[in-house]
Amino acid sequence: MANEAVVKEVEMRNAVCKTLLGGVILMGMQMGIPIPSAQAAGKYAIILQAGKESHEGMARAVHALLYTRELKEHGHDVVLVFDGAGTEWAEEFTKPDSTHKLTPMYRELSKLGVTKIICDFCAGAFGVKERLAQRQLPLVAEYAGHPSIAKWIDQGYQLLIL
């Protein structure tokens, strides 16, 4: 019984706090005071370097796609970069007849408007450049044949490398 009373008291306090805070925010808005969002949108470049040959590479690819989607859905600016052995994933995901279980996640990113780029040099080094070029995908060679990470940092992006 004592626990139920404590729980009810905590619930009541939380309800009162929410009501008071809501009233303060409403008053501020009515007075023309800008109310900042809880979190300003950020900028992220998610760089997938892991290849297709291992369980770890699969996990990194899953998380690169998952993090990209979540950040985009929360209003952040996100760029997905396929670099190193990660260019193999770009080749797999863009096959017209791909049946890989991660391909639907990749295609969903296109619907969300995520920018995707592929390292030109690494696509060649990992033997997928010709197929990617035939599909007219964005092969980028800004710095020594690779995408420039300085460019993204200069534009305020945070890098997440998987």
What function would you assign to each model-found segment?
Residues 10-21:
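Bacterial N-terminal signal peptides that target proteins for export
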Residues 27-35:
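C-terminal segment of classical bacterial N-terminal signal peptides
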Residues 38-40:
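Boundary at the C-terminal end of the N-terminal hydrophobic targeting segment
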Residues 45-62, 90-94:
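Short, glycine-rich nucleotide/cofactor-binding loops
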Residues 59-74:
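Histidine-anchored nucleotide/phosphate-binding helix
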Residues 68, 79-84, 116-120:
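Short internal beta-strands
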Residues 96-128:
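A glycine-rich helix N-cap at a beta->alpha junction
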Residues 108-109, 126-147:
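A short aromatic-anchored loop/beta-hairpin motif
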